[in-house]
């Protein structure tokens, strides 16, 4: 543990972060802003923080604004996302709505290209004759999916990466 007499500046980065988080989670405010809150914490302590964040929210519902690069770790915690790239707001939406638009389309190159025509394709990967398109768009129920083409979804971190890389040359 941390002695009450120990100066914050004498602690390791991880312990400084932990001490600051204890204060942040116990502050009586309607909005709590946390910039890279898990900086210096190992995986176990990050997980503990996320659990304490949820517990704190359940005890006193309020808005937590998190700025983080560890998107995969917070995906299950967040309801709403703002994504900034080059000082520009590029996404401002409910997480569930965003993920409902994040699709992978995989199959033979020609069939994938035909299927994604007219859709917002953020990027593509290709391995031999198999192509994967990362689509960020609503898929029309009228689109016929060829048997050789598989649809899937991707997570918030992959969507963040694709959106902040400026979209695709395929748009």
How would you name each of these model-derived features?
Residues 1-65, 69-72, 76-79, 85, ...:
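ABC transporter nucleotide-binding domains
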Residues 24, 114-115, 159, 163:
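Residues that scaffold the ATP/ADP-binding catalytic core of kinase and kinase-like folds
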Residues 27-30, 108, 117-120, 143-148:
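Short glycine/proline-enriched coil/turn segments at helix->beta-strand junctions
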Residues 32-37, 112-115, 139-144:
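Short, surface-exposed beta-strand/loop "edge" segments at domain boundaries and coil↔beta transitions
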Residues 50, 99, 160-161:
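Conserved protein kinase catalytic domain
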Residues 54-65, 69-135:
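ABC transporter nucleotide-binding domain
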Residues 123, 127-171:
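C-terminal coupling/interaction segments
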């Amino acid at each position: 543990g941390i002695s009450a007499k120990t100066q914050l500046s004498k602690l390791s980065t991880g312990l400084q972060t932990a001490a600051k988080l204890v204060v942040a989670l116990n502050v009586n405010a309607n909005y709590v802003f946390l910039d890279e809150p898990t900086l210096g914490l190992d995986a176990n302590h990050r997980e503990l923080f996320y659990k304490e964040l949820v517990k704190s929210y359940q005890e006193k519902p309020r808005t937590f604004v998190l700025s983080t690069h560890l998107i995969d770790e917070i995906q299950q915690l967040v309801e709403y996302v703002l994504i900034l790239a080059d000082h520009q707001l590029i996404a401002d939406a409910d997480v569930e709505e965003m993920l409902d638009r994040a699709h992978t389309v995989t199959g033979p190159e020609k069939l994938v290209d035909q299927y994604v025509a007219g859709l917002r394709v953020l990027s593509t990967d290709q391995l031999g004759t198999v192509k994967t398109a990362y689509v960020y768009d609503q898929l029309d129920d009228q689109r016929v999916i060829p048997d050789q083409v598989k649809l899937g979804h991707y997570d918030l971190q992959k969507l963040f990466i694709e959106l902040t890389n400026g979209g695709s040359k395929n748009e």
